[in-house]
Design a protein with these regions (language model features):
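Active-site loop segments of alpha/beta catalytic cores
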Residues: 1-31, 36-39, 53, 89-94, ...
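Segments that shape or occlude catalytic/ligand-binding pockets
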Residues: 32-71
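A contiguous, low-structure linker/loop signature
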Residues: 71-112, 131-135
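Intrinsic-disorder/low-complexity, polar/charged segments
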Residues: 45-47, 96-104, 116, 286-287
Length: 332
């Protein structure tokens, strides 16, 4: 059973010889500083460097997938924000939000992939990484997190409370753009789409607003991916207790959770597959025997796909990540 077959079977709920161990990319970025030493160009912007980094994540660390990009800023770039493109030490980040009204942002933006050089680089990288044996994951920043990367989160959250209709229209506009971006990824060769939406937590939005603003977007996104036979993983940060019943209504192939979530509890509440949730703080700091213990516990808790629980720090040691992948593969 090769790596692509194993992961696709796991996402369908079919029997596998063991759980896959992956790091999708995007927010869950394993292109850490130590890995990037011999890659001279910026892996966030340069096509050759992006492809090389994705390959090294698998070959050096042992994660069983290729995944691009390595950040959460590509999606917001066409909407008039100022971005730091990152380097070997720092991930890309938003430096300045678009200060315009939401209506004006929608009128003035033309978020075609061909107009966004970095997204176009991601699409080309997926095409280069496409193969028969190793799954390629295209990473999408979710609609709430993309919206709050374009405009100041405080501004959008105020609008959610005071001008909900206008906020909903904007988030839906962003979601439609993300759907088209994901379709381009699939056309280029992505086997799976992973959505990370760290701003869309029950703790930040509350259950009522999560159901009103996030759930309809996920539902529409998933419908579009079903139409092109593409499995989807959704990652939600934070404590998901208040929204877990809502998540159970999604027709999604896997849900990924932060380390704060008890996976046995999640397993009892959800009908879909679970991914996660080895603490990224533990992966950063060790010790290695504790990493093995927590990885073993994740599998014992019913996790179908083993992965880091959230975004990895750029200073995470390769050896700590390798301990996790080696354990899952039976090398330890």
């Amino acid at each position: 059973m090769n790596e692509k077959e194993r992961l696709l079977r796991a996402l369908k709920g079919e029997e596998t010889d063991r759980p896959p161990v992956i790091c999708p990319g995007g927010m869950m970025n394993a292109a850490v500083t130590e890995l990037l030493g011999e890659i001279n160009a910026n892996h966030n912007t340069d096509l050759d460097a992006m492809v090389a980094a994705a390959i090294k994540v698998r070959e050096v660390i042992g994660f069983e997938n290729y995944g691009v990009p390595f950040c959460m800023t590509c999606e917001s770039e066409p909407f008039g924000v100022i971005i730091s493109e990152g380097d070997k030490i720092n991930e890309p980040r938003i430096l300045e939000y678009n200060q315009s009204k939401l209506e004006d942002i929608m009128k003035s933006s033309d978020p075609k992939i061909s107009n966004n050089l970095r997204s176009e680089t991601v699409i080309k990288a997926i095409g280069r990484l496409k193969n028969d044996d190793i799954p390629v994951i295209g990473n999408i920043t979710g609609p709430i997190s993309t919206a709050t990367s374009i405009v100041d989160p405080i501004k959008l959250f105020k609008m959610i409370r005071k001008e909900p209709d206008e906020a909903h229209i904007f988030i839906e506009y962003i979601n439609n753009y993300l759907i088209e971006y994901a379709k381009e990824m699939v056309r280029a060769g992505a086997d799976i789409i992973a959505i990370s939406d760290p701003t869309a937590t029950g703790e930040i939005l509350g259950k009522k607003n999560f159901d009103k603003f996030a759930m309809p977007m996920y539902t529409e996104f998933l419908k579009s991916m079903r139409e092109i036979n593409t499995p989807v993983i959704i990652h939600i940060c934070g404590d998901a207790k208040t929204i877990i019943d809502s998540l159970n209504s999604l027709e999604v192939q896997a849900l990924s959770f932060d380390s704060i979530v008890n996976m046995r509890f999640a397993k009892s509440k959800l009908n879909t597959r679970l991914m996660g949730n080895v603490s990224t703080l533990l992966l950063q700091n060790g010790p290695k025997d504790k990493i093995i213990s927590i990885t073993k516990n994740a599998i014992g808790s019913g996790v179908d796909i083993v992965s880091p629980a959230c975004g990895l720090g750029m200073s995470t040691p390769l050896g700590n990540l390798r301990v996790m992948t080696d354990y899952v593969k039976g090398s330890i």
